[in-house]
Amino acid sequence: MDNLARSVVNAIEAMEAVPLGDVKSFYGAGVYALYYTGDHQAYAELTAANSESLVQPIYVGKAVPKGGRRGREVMSRATTKALSSRIREHAKSVRTAENLDIADFRARWLVVEDIWIALGESAMIRRYRPVWNAVLDGYGNHDPGSGRINGKRSMWDTLHPGRTWAKKYPARDDTD
């Protein structure tokens, strides 16, 4: 299994990095990585690591076809736009953040068959421990809808305010 996971990781890393704000709609589901090169003080080490080439993602995620998470009949690669939709959702989150600039982000992705999606995502996270996956929780969150708000605002939304729906949550007092 390690060789298969490594193959998926290598394939993602070989993909051209596209400015996050320029990702167009395309068909497929799969795995993606986001990279940061900006000047936010919290990410100085990450920016330094990515100064010459993009070697350390800030976030890794996956997008499965509709129905895929629950084992239902899933849409085919040719009919789902799950991956581009998810990446573009992330672009919207970055754009709404008051202290981030979309121009400082790049994305790589790999369209794969459903069976490889979870393997690819977990292998990338294990390999890189991206800060928005492993340290600063909440970037990948969706608006939970009414009646489902429990807990406090995510650490990500506390450090990077701007997502309107995150303001529904009580503020955190443990993030400085």
Residue ranges and their predicted role:
Residues 1-58, 62-176:
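Boundary/linker segments flanking structured domains
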